[in-house]
């Protein structure tokens, strides 16, 4: 029975392990291998004069990153990783790696992002890269459990759609048999329809597709969105839910992923609730104190502005009370000052993580807002119909999983947080 | 504070509820409403002479399926649903439904599937329909927790891809900027690449897209697939994992979703392990005993054959030891009898739920099998490359979530198990 490498301790007597050859060293009478599996690294030491000839032959022929099986005696040895090594009684090459490798897994030579992504299967063998994706897995699993515990129903909405969420821009067209269709930008309209269906609280973790021309370190053309929508709730209610989720997920990662965090040399601080709520008008004032290109009321926040505010606030925060004109048509205006709306962004000091709002649930107001945005209510009929048959008040948000992971782990490029990024130029592997 | 309707008991003194007007009845001096939220139904009784005039006015104007808020005194009353009713002190219409409704939510008139799907937001208000999707949510959440507890890493693989998984058929083309791309049929190649990346055990729950022309009660063009892949495992190991998952999920639903199961009048039997393993050759013999169109060795199983075998076996079972020729190129042939391979299907008595196999991990054998299928190894280079740099032995499967829910809940049409189906003719809503 194979043991995970982490389970082999200095006290273990004998062990069988499988893994990849991380390093090979030859010191005259001794050969050393480092063998790596997803749980850790162990040294295999071959005293050339003491092992059977066939083990020596195999050891001589094995290349780095080949997959091997080793069975042998475990010895405590202070200098080795984890304070133990294996002296093999059996050594089998399960799968041979060609040389040279297209990428250095032992990270002695650092590679450009494009080179890394071209050989992502090798890149992701690096313990630091693996740590990111194991943490990402912990994030999505913890978010699923948390939202289910809060009574949210896990839904799956279609990714092939006939209409755009927010007008016709930034859509990838699909040939759907004899019809034209699009890859969905957002589950927005569908999760709202599930409020009309009386589901009351839903969530989805799934892909979204945006044909943005931007090719930056924080944009992807295919990303993973965590979407939530709750009935009989306003923007304040769902901001609290979002805040609770963020804190829960950070806390879970801090407790459950300590080895991966150590691998990344990250001392994860769990943010504390409540996050500050900063009105939009105040946010641009804060930004204008330091940024070069001053913002006027009604401007969207530039990346420079986001950084300036983030530097001032120094933690997660919400920007609230946005001008209605710069938010999507479905954001609910304040009844007493309709030039502002019940929309919010959740910000990490580095960038925006999530957008949300209380939504308009009144059919006629929604039609008015769609028209005011220069869109045609006719093309939204499938979405508008539910608003005529008992749509409850509701609110929700969408949270970018890659941005959440990127900011949590202080990654410089969003591509670090997705296994196989899709961007303006990359469609492979 | 609003109470969920289920939480209002005959012992409750007073309560505020929100919900949809399920039914309205007028009996001279008394008006009755049934109000429905996602947790249940409650009767609201209005003694016309005893309530304030404004409540009476509101009650007279309210239409079925409008959203209302009711605050009042709770009285135990045997004949009412749940043995209690509310006599309102406040009654507010939150959102008015137009009349007539495009679909009858109280299910007095049953509707055609197409009519139902055209107004899915109303259809899903029916307690029976809601029950299906709340159970589906329990299934995906329980599967996520189960697989995480078994050490599987939750991954997200791209849905926009440059190449087909199994040749060029049944793909939806996308215009990806200036390039042609496709919507992915299956995470197969990507989850295998994550085995090369040393992740050792992964899972994904996500959409798959198949441009099949079939328009049957068990095909969808967009479906949800639960995909698993495990390294250093063979077909038997992953069949056990799949079996454990099925039993776990059934058990979870049986325990956690008793009200939804009652709504569907389903007495859920948790299948018992191990499921029978029936070799393909034996399976066609069983089928040929009863079916009209006899199968020859090397034929795929027809729906009639699946039913015939299912009737004989009477429970979940595996079909194993398939002819290599009728399985995908990546299925591992038995070394001692390469005309058979280590592939399997998990069957419910009604239909196939899952396909899996130990995969080929040897590069040259894989190239040979791709060519033997009439495909070009050159177009699979991005997939083949990892096999040259230390690909471990691995096995896995893909499980259709809709089919799992459909068979669990004895639904006649797979469209019952997906909120917004996409089929040969349907792209809306």
From Swiss-Prot, chains A, B:
| Residues reported to bind ATP | 210-212, 218-220, 352, 400-403
Question: What is the predominant subcellular site recorded for this chain?
Answer: cytoplasm
Q: Give any GO molecular function from the UniProt entry.
A: aspartate-tRNA(Asn) ligase activity
Which chemical reaction does it catalyze?
Answer: tRNA(Asx) + L-aspartate + ATP = L-aspartyl-tRNA(Asx) + AMP + diphosphate
Where on the tree of life does the source sit, at the highest rank? Archaea
Q: How is the cofactor bound?
A: Binds 3 Mg(2+) cations per subunit. The strongest magnesium site (Mg1) is bound to the beta- and gamma-phosphates of ATP and four water molecules complete its coordination sphere.
The biological process GO terms on file are: aspartyl-tRNA aminoacylation
Q: Which residues bind L-aspartate?
A: 166, 210, 355, 359
Q: What is its EC number?
A: 6.1.1.23
Localization: Cytoplasm
Q: Assembly and partners?
A: Homodimer.
Which family is it part of?
A: Belongs to the class-II aminoacyl-tRNA synthetase family. Type 2 subfamily.
Protein name as catalogued: Aspartate--tRNA(Asp/Asn) ligase
> From what organism does this protein derive?
Methanoculleus marisnigri (strain ATCC 35101 / DSM 1498 / JR1)
